[in-house]
Structure formats: structure tokens, C-alpha cells
Amino acid sequence: MSDDIDDPRRDFLVKMLTAGAFATGVWSLPATVQSMGKIPKLLPPGKSFFDISGEVMVNNKLATLDTFVKNNDVVSTGSGAHAVFVVGKDAFILRGNSSMEIEGNEIISTIRVFSGKLLSVFGHREDKKPLHMRSSTATIGIRGTGVYIESDPEKTYLCTCYGITDLSSNVDKNVQERIVSEHHDKPKYLLAKPSQKGKLITPAPMINHTDMELTLIEELVGREPPFGLEGGLYKGPRRDY
């Protein structure tokens, strides 16, 4: 990825930051991004965290910006905290009161979201095998995409921000659905108990995450999302830099 400020995408990010867009809420951003105040760029080797606020733990030890996150680690956050970090080709924003485990050998194979809220962008798997996300009520197959998930015992919220996901209910493995999304097209709830219409997978609104956040964490792994940040228009597959 080039650091050239003439890159229109990075130039736009710089303008938003220097104009105080984060602080003024122009983009209606959560505190996760408002508090950063720095331009994202490809993280160097050996670096995991881009931003930490509040109590962030890795394997039950208090994390700092120098903490390295690797496969088979557990990352958790306290009330009002957040963590923005990278593992390999994948990047995450873990919001407050959340806990996740990263499973895998050389690359991530499974993300377990025990509780809370997680925004993720995933690179394409070199072994061509799908990565899985697991929550209390859902199993999600993922290939090179961006997703936002909220997990609690009663339901899982999932927005396939772009790309393809395969949803499966943990309550009934026969309940499955493939989502093909260009730009937050088909958010879903995966329920612990059937809805009034007897459904375990139901439509949902887009909530609690933004295109600016997706752009920021894609930057950390040297990619750009498949939409125009200024207008949100779909413009094709993601590009690596």
C-alpha cells in the first residue's frame, strides 16, 4: 500500500480526520473510531494493535499497543472499551463488553464470538477453505469479506457488509441461507427460538457499524473495500495494495 497522500481514498480519510469529522460525528461514528485521531496505514510485521481504549485483555492479561495477538488467543474488552487490531490478513474492531477467540494454525480457521460486538474484514484464504465464525446461535462460513456480528444468548445479528457468507442455525442445522452482498444488502437475525412466523433466520436492519470503520480496518491490512467512501457506491471487488 502506498502512503502517497495523492491516493484519493487516503486523501479523503485525511480530510475527514483533519476536519474533525470523527469528533463532530459527521459520520455518526461510535467512540471506537472517534477516539483514534490518527491516519490508518498498513501495520508493520510484529504489530497487532492499532488502537486500544479502556480495559483490553489478551489471554486474561492487560494488553498494550505492543501486545502481539496470534492464533488461539482470546481477546476481551471491558465496559466502554474497544480494541482495533490485526491478525495476519484479517482486521477487527472489538467493541466494549465483548469476548472472542481466534482459532487456527498458520491462518485463522475459526472466530468464536462468545459475547458482544465485532466488526471484521477477512482476506482470501490461501488454502481456499472457508473461515468460520461461531456464536451462541449461528455458524457462518466466510470467504474474503467484511462482516459485523453481535452475539448474545437469545440471538445473533449478522450484517454481511460485502462478499458471500453461508449462514447456519445452531438450533437446527437444516436451517441455512447463503448471503451475497454488495453493500450491507441483507442483514439477518439468527434466533435461539423461532419467531412468531416460525423462522430461525429473519431480516434485520443495518445497525451499529459504518463504512468509515470498514475502510479504516481494511487499510490496516493493505486493502480497500468495494465501495466508494464518499458516496457509498459499489465499485467492484476489493483491491490489495
Locate each region found by the language model.
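Flexible, surface-exposed loop/linker segments and immediately adjacent secondary-structure boundaries
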Residues: 12, 16-20, 27, 32-70, ...
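Secretory targeting signals
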Residues: 1-11
